[in-house]
Amino acid sequence: MTRKTSWTLAFLCLLWGWCGAARADEFSQVNHYAVRMFSYGLLTIDSRTGDIHIEGWDNPRLEIEAEKVVRAKSNEAAKPLYEELQVVLQGQDKNVQLRTLYPPRKVWRPFRGEARLSVNYRIKMPFDANLALKCVDGDVWIRGLVGKQQILVNYGDVEIDIPSLDRLRILRAHAWLGYVQSDLHGEDKGGFGPGIYFWNPSGEQDINVKVRMGGVFVYRDDYGSTTR
């Protein structure tokens, strides 16, 4: 068998796996988690696949709704897939970590089955706490937070609503390939390397956003919720 033929067969097998995931139905399971969290604490999120909604509130408590979404041929076939996805919540008060754990990857088929598994999060956290978030593939919405934010997304869109422009000191947002939009200075750019920069010497909130492929949308929250 030639090398070209081997690569062709490998590609066809991978394509067949994707098509199989596409033919399956979607099932979901929702779980809730909660822990005490103080003002100016740090929430660290490490997610691989799935959307994340985060909202700030005036409560010393972190509440999480985790929706496991799987693709399977039946509800019975979906049940063992839920067990393969692990939501891990550790810590409390000043330092909390939230992670999504997937099944170990096999060297010869590193991405087998990953298209079938994702976790969507809806999170409420103290409005003045800090956030560090990493997501490989998914959209992120953040609203009502005045603490520091460090956001890194490989593939997806990030929308941030700024609750107080007076408290914002630095906003750095950059997309390696994609689109940025903001009503802070009226930015509206697309292509390679678009970015947003805002600086207010009297503010105290720092926001840094990096997106590899996708969009960054930053809005003032003066007029209520925004919708893309």
Predicted regions: what they are:
Residues S39, R48, D58, Q92, ...:
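Repetitive beta-strand solenoid architecture
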Residues A66-F111:
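Mid-chain, structured segments of secreted extracytoplasmic proteins
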Residues G50-I52, G138, G156-I162:
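Extended lipid/amphipathic-ligand handling interfaces
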Residues L42-D46, H53, E63-E65, Q97-R99, ...:
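Soluble periplasmic/extracytoplasmic beta-strand elements of cell-envelope proteins
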Residues Q92-W141, L145, F217:
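Surface-exposed, polar helix/loop patches in the mature regions of secreted/periplasmic/lumenal proteins
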Residues M1-T2:
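N-terminal hydrophobic targeting signals that begin at the initiator methionine
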Residues S28-F38, E65, G144, L152-V153, ...:
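Short, surface-exposed interaction patches in beta-rich subdomains
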Residues T5, L9-C13, W18-I54, V69-A77, ...:
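Short acidic/polar N-terminal linker immediately downstream of export determinants
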